């Protein structure tokens, strides 16, 4: 940990100024800087541009290439407007470092760890460099364990791995944001953990909406900011590619501190992992590298691996990552999503069809997958229940065309029973969320895994065939469904 020369103007003057360079070339967000012989900065060092007459320009760059002839090529983390050849550049002799620890909760940061929420400076002197190695193999926690979310459809059919990586697929307006906020809320309540949200190359409006919704739902506590459950790091669409490429590492660095020092379970959200690859592709072209397949950077797998391998469980704590994945032109073979899939342990697919039916969370039970759903990991009882739920829903899906044309009466007795149970299961997969209480008026429910399994076993066994299907809609555990059925009858 070190005092951070990249996060505030006043500290730059404290940086030892012996290693000064000068800008010799500017091409968009890329600068070439000449240094005195024998004083070349290291790769990934942060450089701070000094304005004329010591006027602070606040442009921080990161060294990407050593060109020879005492020159380096650096990528700017902010706009290069107003920079000129001949300006002095300070080598900070360290990578970009960002504030870490409890004082980051409830705040919004940019890629350099500077707060951008107009709430004043961050109350910490503890900073950490954004570039570091993945934990050594001996530090890893290799035990496979389920990360219980309290959300029935996720825990039963596509369970998350503690310290794993989950891909979140869904279009606009199907409930990605609400699902993310519920997960942030549940990890804080059930696991005593915290969350870090990395907004990578997405719309500024969406980042602002998320912040306002988090304040409204209590995930960010305005009265007592220290009781907030999440830190936000944004590098939005309008930022230079350097910032969008590094903002994921800034968020990850904050999450690593909570895992390694505070020994907590951490949820790391990255929205959107595709934009991280896209920014790397832009930077790669600016640095003059030969493009690879479909115009992507030749270092695509390495860059993705260096980010993903740091997201893991250690003996101290865990980082479980949920990454929104944009699939360009719905082509799953595109190198960007294809490289991401190699790292994922589970996929959560949100369905517009379910959202249209009013079933929230609109997680598709048949399309969502998890490598954790194996009998040796989750146990025989969980595995069997999940498989029977999927088989029932799959059969219902196959029968829907027949029902639409001929009606329910033309089905066999067995198929009619399957349809009735499938409709109950479909409704029982819905759940009231804590963060949606403000909008729905229904109190949120956290359902433990054992309760979830028991509920679906009772539906599958036929014990609840006599209950109306609306009794299963937007309830927590199965006891609430039976109580609701009694109320409907009276």
Swiss-Prot record:
PROSITE patterns: ATPASE_ALPHA_BETA
InterPro entries linked to this entry: AAA+_ATPase, ATP-synt_VA_C, ATP_synth_F1_bsu, ATPase_a/bsu_AS, ATPase_alpha/beta_chains, ATPase_F1/V1/A1_a/bsu_N, ATPase_F1/V1/A1_a/bsu_N_sf, ATPase_F1/V1/A1_a/bsu_nucl-bd
Enzyme class: translocase
Main location: plastid
Annotated CDD domains: ATP-synt_F1_beta_C, ATP-synt_F1_beta_N, F1-ATPase_beta_CD
Pfam annotation, one family: ATP-synt_ab
Residue positions binding ATP: 170-177
Compartments (UniProt record): Plastid, Chloroplast thylakoid membrane
Tree of life domain: Eukaryota
SMART domains, per the entry: AAA
UniProt-listed Enzyme Commission number(s): 7.1.2.2
GO molecular function: ATP binding; ATP hydrolysis activity; proton-transporting ATP synthase activity, rotational mechanism
GO BP annotations, alphabetical order: proton motive force-driven mitochondrial ATP synthesis
Keyword set, alphabetical order: ATP synthesis, ATP-binding, CF(1), Chloroplast, Hydrogen ion transport, Ion transport, Membrane, Nucleotide-binding, Plastid, Thylakoid, Translocase, Transport
Topological category with respect to the lipid bilayer: Peripheral membrane protein
Cellular component GO terms, alphabetical: chloroplast thylakoid membrane; mitochondrion; proton-transporting ATP synthase complex
Record bears the keyword ATP-binding: yes
Family affiliation: Belongs to the ATPase alpha/beta chains family.
Function text: Produces ATP from ADP in the presence of a proton gradient across the membrane. The catalytic sites are hosted primarily by the beta subunits.
Assembly mode: F-type ATPases have 2 components, CF(1) - the catalytic core - and CF(0) - the membrane proton channel. CF(1) has five subunits: alpha(3), beta(3), gamma(1), delta(1), epsilon(1). CF(0) has four main subunits: a(1), b(1), b'(1) and c(9-12).
Protein name as annotated: ATP synthase subunit beta, chloroplastic
Species assigned in the record: Ipomoea obscura
Lineage of the organism: Eukaryota, Viridiplantae, Streptophyta, Embryophyta, Tracheophyta
Protein encoded by which gene: atpB
């Amino acid at each position: 940990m070190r005092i951070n020369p990249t996060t505030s103007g006043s500290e730059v003057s404290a940086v030892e100024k012996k290693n000064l360079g000068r800008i010799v070339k500017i091409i968009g967000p890329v600068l070439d800087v000449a240094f005195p012989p024998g004083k070349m900065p290291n790769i990934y060092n942060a450089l701070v541009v000094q304005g004329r007459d010591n006027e602070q320009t606040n442009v921080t760059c990161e060294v990407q290439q050593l060109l020879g002839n005492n020159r380096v090529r650096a990528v700017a983390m902010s706009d290069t407007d107003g920079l000129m050849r001949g300006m002095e550049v300070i080598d900070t002799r360290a990578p970009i470092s960002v504030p870490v620890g409890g004082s980051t909760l409830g705040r919004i940061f940019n890629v350099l760890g500077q707060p951008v929420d107009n709430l004043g400076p961050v109350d910490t002197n503890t900073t950490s460099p954004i570039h570091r190695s993945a934990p050594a193999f001996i530090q890893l926690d290799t035990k496979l364990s389920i990360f219980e979310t309290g959300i029935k459809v996720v825990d039963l059919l596509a369970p998350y791995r503690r310290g794993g990586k989950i891909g979140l697929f869904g279009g606009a307006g199907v409930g990605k944001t609400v699902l993310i906020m519920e997960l942030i809320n549940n990890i804080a309540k059930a696991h005593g953990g915290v969350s870090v949200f990395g907004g990578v190359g997405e719309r500024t409006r969406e980042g602002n909406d998320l912040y306002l919704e988090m304040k409204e739902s209590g995930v960010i506590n305005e009265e007592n900011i220290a009781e907030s459950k999440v830190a936000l790091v944004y590098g939005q669409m309008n930022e230079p590619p350097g910032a969008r490429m590094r903002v994921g590492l800034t968020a990850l660095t904050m999450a690593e501190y909570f895992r390694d020092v505070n020994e907590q379970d951490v949820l790391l959200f990255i929205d959107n992992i595709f934009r991280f690859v896209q920014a790397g592709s832009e930077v790669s072209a600016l640095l003059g590298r030969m493009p690879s397949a479909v115009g992507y950077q030749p270092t695509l797998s390495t860059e993705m691996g260096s980010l993903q391998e740091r997201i893991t469980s250690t003996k101290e704590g865990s980082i479980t990552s949920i990454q929104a994945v944009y699939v360009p032109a719905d082509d799953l073979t595109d190198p960007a999503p294809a490289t991401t899939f190699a790292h994922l342990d589970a996929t959560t697919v949100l369905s517009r069809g379910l959202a249209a039916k009013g079933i929230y969370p609109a997680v598709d039970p048949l399309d969502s997958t998890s490598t954790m759903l194996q009998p040796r990991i989750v146990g025989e009882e969980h595995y069997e229940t999940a498989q029977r739920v999927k088989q029932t829903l799959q059969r219902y899906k196959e029968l829907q065309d027949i029902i639409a044309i001929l009606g329910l009466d033309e089905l066999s007795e067995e198929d009619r029973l399957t349809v009735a149970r499938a409709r109950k299961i479909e409704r029982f997969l819905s759940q009231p969320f804590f963060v949606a209480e403000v909008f729905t008026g229904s109190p949120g429910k956290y359902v433990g895994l054992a309760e979830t399994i028991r509920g679906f076993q009772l539906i599958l066994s036929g014990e609840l065939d006599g209950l109306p299907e609306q009794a299963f809609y937007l309830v927590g555990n199965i006891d609430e469904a039976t109580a609701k059925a009694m109320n409907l009858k009276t």
